[in-house]
Amino acid sequence: MLCQFSFHNFRSYRDETIFDFQAAPFEEFKDSLIRGDKTQEDLLPVGVIYGPNGGGKSNLLRALGCVISLITDPVYDLKKLVQMLLFNRRVSALLTCLMINPRQNQQHSSFFFRVGSCEYQYQIEILHDNILFEMLYRRVLGASSAEKVFERDSDKITFGLFDGQGINTAVNEKMSFLSFLVINYSIPVITEVITWFEACIVQDYANPMMEKGLLLSKEPTFKKKLITMMNDMGIDISGYRIDSQRDEFLLQRTLQGKMYELPFLNESDGTQKLFVALPVIWVALQEGA
C-alpha cells in the first residue's frame, strides 16, 4: 500500500508537494485507520485531493501516474509482466519539468510503500527524459534503518541487499534500472517491488478516455457486488453481459418479470461514470483492507 508520494518541478508544481497517508496521532476516527503494531505507523485508508478549478489536482495524479508508467511500460512492451494485467499504461502526460529554468530543474519523485512486512522507498530524478538518479531502499517493519537495494547516480550503480556481480549496469539513460532488472533478471526483492507498481491503478476522470475503459471480472462474486453497489446508488440494473457478436456491452433491467437490455453507451452519463468508477474503487478498497 502507498504510504507517501512526494514530487516537485512537475508541470504546474515547482515546490515539493507531499501526498501523505500517514495518520496524525488523533483519537478521532482511529477505528477507521489501517492499524500498525507498536513498531508501525497507522495509515489512512483514503486520501483526498481537493482545491479550486485549475488548482493542479489532475497534475498531481499525472505526476503519480507518469512515474508508474515509466517503470511498467518497458516491462509490458517486452512481455515481462509479473502480473497478468497492467492497469496503468501510457499515461499521456510526459515527465516534463516546470519550464522556469529547465537546465537546472530536474523532476524529482519519491515513493514510500509497504509490501507485506517491508517498507520500500523508491526515488527517481529526471531531466529531459534522462534519468539522473534512482534508488531503492528496503526496511523491515520494526527495524530502525533501511537497507540499500540499489542506487544509481548518473552512470554509476551500486548494490546493497543483493550481490550485483554478473549484473549488467550499462543501462540506457532513458530506462529505469528497476525496469531493466525486471526484464533481464529474476531477483525476488525486485519482483516484489515491480508487482506493487504493476498493481497500481491511477484513474484520472479529467481524461475523457478514462470513461471508455471498463474493469470487469467473470467472477460471480464481483458481478454480484457491482450490481449491489449500483442498486444501492439508485440504479436499478439486474445484470449485464457482453454481446461478442455485436461487440457491445449491455446493461440488463427486469420490469414486471421481463428482462430488458440497453446498450451501455445509451445509458445516462452518470450511470456510465459510476459503472466505470465503482469497480476500480472496490478493488482499491479490497486491496487497501
Question: Which residues make up each language-model segment?
Answer:
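Extended, loop-rich substrate-binding clefts of extracytoplasmic carbohydrate-active enzymes
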Residues: 79-109
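Pre-Walker A-like glycine/lysine-rich segment at the N-terminus of P-loop NTPase domains
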Residues: 2-69
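Conserved amphipathic alpha-helical "coupling/scaffold" segments
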Residues: 102-119, 124
